[in-house]
């Protein structure tokens, strides 16, 4: 613990300042914009085959352009990694969540989220993932990850998230 003297001879301890500095490092984001979890503080620590491994090392989300269900090259790269992981660990079932940004009506965004979820589901099926392992759900604009009236928030909310529901049976390794 560091101490210093201030005028008047009173000792001031800087432990709180040091602790705050260390705590700020722990607040780093664990996901990159492409959905992979290789941001600062992530990677490698997750048990292979665990849900944390999927999120941190594979990436659980893909992003879409405004009013679109088209997969970008970044999205297909993430989905290829998801398909590979899901083939390696076949005991998992999962839900593909479709989301939209806050612009547009509730009904339209619900439909757009459903189409985004279906696009991801179809892509994973085309990569050999069994349909009986997948389900889709749309949240439309009801579950934003970022809330503000700005493109930086809207782009984070136009997404599909692959959520592992659970595992059954023996490990698929």
Regions found by a protein language model. Give the residues of each.
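Bacterial N-terminal signal peptides that target proteins for export
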Residues: 2-16
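C-terminal motif of bacterial Sec signal peptides marking the signal peptidase cleavage site
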Residues: 22-26
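Periplasmic peptidoglycan-binding/tethering modules of Gram-negative envelope proteins
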Residues: 28-93, 165-173
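Extracytoplasmic/secreted proteins, especially bacterial periplasmic and envelope-associated proteins
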Residues: 74-81, 107, 111, 115, ...
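A non-catalytic structural micro-motif
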Residues: 90-99, 114-145, 158-173
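Short beta-alpha junctions and helix-cap segments that line functional grooves
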Residues: 146-150
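A generic structural micro-feature
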Residues: 152-156
């Amino acid at each position: 613990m560091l101490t210093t003297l201030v005028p008047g001879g009173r000792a001031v301890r800087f432990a709180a300042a040091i602790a705050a500095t260390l705590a700020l490092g722990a607040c780093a984001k664990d996901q990159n914009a492409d959905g992979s979890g290789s941001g600062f503080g992530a990677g490698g620590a997750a048990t292979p085959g665990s849900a944390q491994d999927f999120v941190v090392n594979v990436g659980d989300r893909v992003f879409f352009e405004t009013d679109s269900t088209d997969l970008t090259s970044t999205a297909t790269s993430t989905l290829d990694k998801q398909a590979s992981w899901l083939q390696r660990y076949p005991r998992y079932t999962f839900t593909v969540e479709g989301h939209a940004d806050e612009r547009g009506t509730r009904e339209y965004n619900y439909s757009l989220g459903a189409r985004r979820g279906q696009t991801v589901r179809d892509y994973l099926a085309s990569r050999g993932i069994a349909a009986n392992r997948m389900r889709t759900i749309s949240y439309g604009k009801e579950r934003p990850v970022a809330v503000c009236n700005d493109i930086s928030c809207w782009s984070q909310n136009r997404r599909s998230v692959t959520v592992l529901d659970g595992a059954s049976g023996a490990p698929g390794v």
